[in-house]
Amino acid sequence: MKSLQALFGGTFDPVHYGHLKPVETLANLIGLSRVIIMPNNVPPHRPQPEASSAQRKYMLELAIADKPLFTLDERELQRNAPSYTAQTLKAWREEQGPEAPLAFIIGQDSLLNFPTWHDYDTILDNTHLIVCRRPGYPLEMTQAQHQQWLEQHLTHTPDDLHQLPAGKIYLAETPWLNISATLIRERLEKGESCDDLLPENVLNYINQQGLYR
């Protein structure tokens, strides 16, 4: 049996402890062998990043240099068109084969918006969803048919993620750090300290490049 791999996408503008620490805990909780970090190029749902693709990639390389759990996948950065998760996960499934257990990590806030994603209903054909729970967000979807979809796929045991290739949603009890890239950018713009919010080598690079000023 192949070991469970997970993909973790985002803008990472910049990468910070709120990205890394919950996923490291998640890996220990459910037995992830590898987490692939995939930075977006042109996120369809969000404003354009302040840092360039090359700068965001380099910050990620710095952040995971001493963390063997993580690997970096640059495919979305190399696209000139918007990145759609459903397309990316379909391509990943084709690369890994039909039997490999694959998962996509999202936050609870993203789960609530999930039905608005491009071809969202095809994503569970190719991967599981692992949802990192966050305080203050409801556990129910806003529409009845979406709640039914959630309950249909929900599992309470991580074993299902290992034994099945795709199709399950698991709500993980991960620590939540009150850190966001927006907060970091605002603090840097004001000249405030961010020492405890992101890795030191990433912060040094931000200062060297004069980012988020």
UniProtKB/Swiss-Prot annotation:
Protein's GO biological process: NAD biosynthetic process
Reaction catalyzed: nicotinate beta-D-ribonucleotide + ATP + H(+) = deamido-NAD(+) + diphosphate
Keywords assigned: ATP-binding, NAD, Nucleotide-binding, Nucleotidyltransferase, Pyridine nucleotide biosynthesis, Transferase
Molecular function terms, GO-annotated: ATP binding; nicotinamide-nucleotide adenylyltransferase activity; nicotinate-nucleotide adenylyltransferase activity
Keyword hit for Transcription: no
Pathway: Cofactor biosynthesis; NAD(+) biosynthesis; deamido-NAD(+) from nicotinate D-ribonucleotide: step 1/1
A Pfam short name: CTP_transf_like
This enzyme's EC code(s): 2.7.7.18
SUPFAM superfamilies xref list: Nucleotidylyl transferase
Family statement drawn from the similarity comment of this UniProt entry: Belongs to the NadD family.
Function according to Swiss-Prot or TrEMBL: Catalyzes the reversible adenylation of nicotinate mononucleotide (NaMN) to nicotinic acid adenine dinucleotide (NaAD).
Name of this chain's protein: Nicotinate-nucleotide adenylyltransferase
Record organism: Salmonella typhimurium (strain LT2 / SGSC1412 / ATCC 700720)
Lineage, highest ranks first: Bacteria, Pseudomonadati, Pseudomonadota, Gammaproteobacteria, Enterobacterales
Gene name of the encoded protein: nadD
